[in-house]
Amino acid sequence: MSIPVAAGQQRADGGYRPDPATPRHPGAALTAAVLGNFVVILDAVVVNVALPSIRHSLGGGVSGLQWVVDGYTLMFAALLLSAGALSDRVGARRAFGRGMVLFVLASAACGLAPGIGALVTARLVQGSAAAVMMPSSMALIRQVFPGATTRARALAIWAMGGA
């Protein structure tokens, strides 16, 4: 007869009963959070390299190019705190997943944009999705790694992904 033990503790027979709140693949969750953080930061700066090509292909002048760059950053900064509260309400995993899907769709729209107006609109949506992804990826790490030591290590890896 076995003695019942709390979740996350070792049983008398040497087995281990996992905590149901702990995901089965914390490495996969950390990888997704790091990649999400990386693309959010990368997309804020990498568009600067493409500005001459964008101006040649789509036109729009200097003001249009400024909106291509600043629209993303503006939406990201404006919605970051609200998106963090949204992540707390709907759950980090759900918010991160939906933010990532929206980010990918907006990225595809950027690539397919026929003109500068469509590109600016897609960049605004991208910035909104990035605002959802950033705080929810950090909250996801907090949920996946409950121990202080493992959480600190995971947050360090996450921060390096955005550096």
Question: Where are each of the predicted segments found?
Answer:
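Transmembrane-helix bundle of Major Facilitator Superfamily
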Residues: 2-163
